Amino acid sequence: MAKPAKRVAVTGAAGQIAYSLLFRIANGDLLGKDQPVILQLLDLPQAQAAVKGVVMELDDCAFPLLAGVVITDDPKVAFKDADVALLVGARPRSKGMERKDLLSANAEIFTVQGAALNEVASRDVKVLVVGNPANTNAYIAMKSAPDLPKKNFTAMLRLDHNRALSQLAAKSGKPVASIEKLAVWGNHSPTMYPDFRFATAEGESLLKLINDDVWNRDTFIPTVGKRGAAIIEARGLSSAASAANAAIDHVRDWVLGTNGKWVTMGIPSDGSYGIPEDIIYGVPVTCENGEYKRVEGLEIDAFSREKMDGTLAELLEERDGVAHLLKN
């Protein structure tokens, strides 16, 4: 008996990340190889022709799991009964644009999208914000959707998590799949803090295997933090395929579970680890039965506290920068 189709909304559907994302969703990489999907694609009126071109390509792949496609410029159509919403589209920073202008331009987009989700999405909708500044955009959407559970709103730190895994595998000489218990704390920005104090590879402590504080402080943390800029420098374009891959990882693990393994998600704080409530902050989680659960009770040393407070300060500044644009 075939499962009923799940509705997956994707914003910024004509963009580069979506182009790497949509074919993988239609192939079953997001929700499982036995789960039919209906794609509900949102983009601006001027991008509708480009979205239609992408849909022609989706048609031409003849994906068995793709049960339907909706193309629209109306968030209320895109988010209707959505089970998953991937908020990829955001206003990019243009030359000479101040950060506060970027925040307010995105606040406008994400208040509208949050309100539309609030009105028409499934009450269990799983929302992942990919568009930057992702944590604060997720916070804005959450605050604009008072009738949906706060826990439904998440921001993507999985790209930072995966970048950190890859650096640790290269440094330790261990297979990337063998590394467990990595955490990335804070904002999806160069201030975030990749933390491998608890990490193991094939059961051995990575901290003991690598045993290099200077590498951690002066190479590892900045390399992960500035990786996006390094890719733009090398390629001339932003990291779209790796971002799409991280979005797939994030939602797949949230829906299908992590089997006890830690992953990083930006989630609304409950006050743990000294993070004020409701701030969307990257923390280690495990996922089971469609729910995430933060890893509790980790010891925070002085260096980690300083790093965690630094990225929190940036998030608080962003929150305060959009406070006047939010109703509640």
Swiss-Prot record:
BP GO annotations: malate metabolic process; tricarboxylic acid cycle
Pfam family, any one: Ldh_1_N
GO molecular function, one term: L-malate dehydrogenase (NAD+) activity
InterPro entries documented for this protein: L-lactate/malate_DH, Lactate/malate_DH_C, Lactate/malate_DH_N, Lactate_DH/Glyco_Ohase_4_C, Malate_DH_type2, NAD(P)-bd_dom_sf
Catalytic activity: (S)-malate + NAD(+) = oxaloacetate + NADH + H(+)
Positions bound to NAD(+): G12, A13, A14, G15, Q16, I17, A18, N106, Q113, V130, G131, N132
CDD domains: MDH_chloroplast-like (cd01338)
UniProt keywords, alphabetically: NAD, Oxidoreductase, Tricarboxylic acid cycle
EC number: 1.1.1.37
Active site, UniProt feature: H188 (proton acceptor)
Residues that coordinate or bind substrate: R93, R99, N132, R163
Disulphide-bonded residues: none
NCBIfam families reported in the protein's UniProt record: MalateDH-SF1, PRK05442.1
Protein family according to the UniProt entry: Belongs to the LDH/MDH superfamily. MDH type 2 family.
Function as written in the Swiss-Prot or TrEMBL entry: Catalyzes the reversible oxidation of malate to oxaloacetate.
UniProt-recorded name of the protein: Malate dehydrogenase
Organism lineage: Bacteria, Pseudomonadati, Pseudomonadota, Betaproteobacteria, Burkholderiales
